[in-house]
């Protein structure tokens, strides 16, 4: 599903007007769409009592059009004007021509005596107060009227955006209502899918208002959906063998972090990789082999418990037989581990190979100037906010306040696909394409889940999925696996190994429901 900022939506509308679409016609289509969506949801309500809160500007105009169509459909409609409309407002005039349609010019004195009781007894309340043009804090009659919506028992539907929700950032005003449904026009707005805005948007339905699809051809930001993920899934032909589904080389783990190596391999296998080989120290190999008999091994030479100077050449010599390299989880930051990372990334065999770079490999790179110049052209970097801060010489606070912008900027600057992990993980590529995960699941906030994610992305790359799509699909399946767990057990207690098992279930569900 494509997402737009407020400015992008204004530009699309301006282009539509330049092509001959009229503002009045667009508003009529939008308001009629709102009315039809409300009526569809109220078919089981005998009285269909509808309250419409109308603000200034186009959002209020959409509400007036919706009120007219709902009245004409037989609903009992009451309209509350929070501010005076223009004397020549054609949509308001059309409402006044209809008998038994109450229009109340609201003031603060009427909120408790008139609006609040109506809100409590309505089958549906339409928030058509403020839309993408909001730029000020809610106060006065706007704040007081919207606060009554916390008392509603019927369905609360927002027109384009819940009033007080920032279309670009998802920030919400303290008086912003939590809608059951948001009926947004043309394209969904970015802020509806970013926390905390997503928690106020409810179900988001995009209404077709007749815009030429060509006007949105350049939109490069999407929210991941099941349909998108299904389209990215690699095929599983019947006439196949393990080589068909990719050979993954994993370089991970150390004496202190054997579990990281296990989880990476497990993630790759559960994502469908045909063969997974772990290149690791003898102690790591021994630990993983007891848990994963499906994995093959390359034993790294060691000195004093860390990779020896020739460890990188051992792995590089084997890489021509592999389709993807995963590097970093649990390696630690010893001199030997850092030399292994730098040596591998400098190896000619790696330059044209898809590489997933995670955890300690990222921390190693962050210590060197212009580190990204040593990479090939097909890397996927998977930092958490702390690692992103180190890589970009920023702070965690800055990373978290500019997750989308920083992901895009760094993907372009580094020439690689970037996966910024966290609640609603962001995936960006050098061309500016951006994917946003719809999932924010605290069950994933546990050790080892990032290792599983890195492994799953590597497993998908090995099956021939392109880096941007592999990163997005890996993120989606990883989070969907956690959702399956949380639906049964709640938001805590999930183990990283259970996420890996859930990846195969999530993929099967996509295929089954497609």
Q: What is each stretch, according to the model?
A:
Residues 1-82, 181, 192-359, 363-380, ...:
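Small-residue (G/A/S/T)-rich helix-start motifs and N-terminal tracts that mark the onset
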Residues 35, 88-90, 101, 115, ...:
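Short Asp/Glu-rich motifs
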Residues 36-129, 137-159, 346-351, 372, ...:
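Nucleotide and nucleotide-moiety/phosphate-recognizing core
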Residues 84-85, 108-109, 163-165, 188-189, ...:
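Short beta->alpha connector loops
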Residues 116, 122-124, 129-220:
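Internal gly/pro-rich beta-alpha loop/helix module
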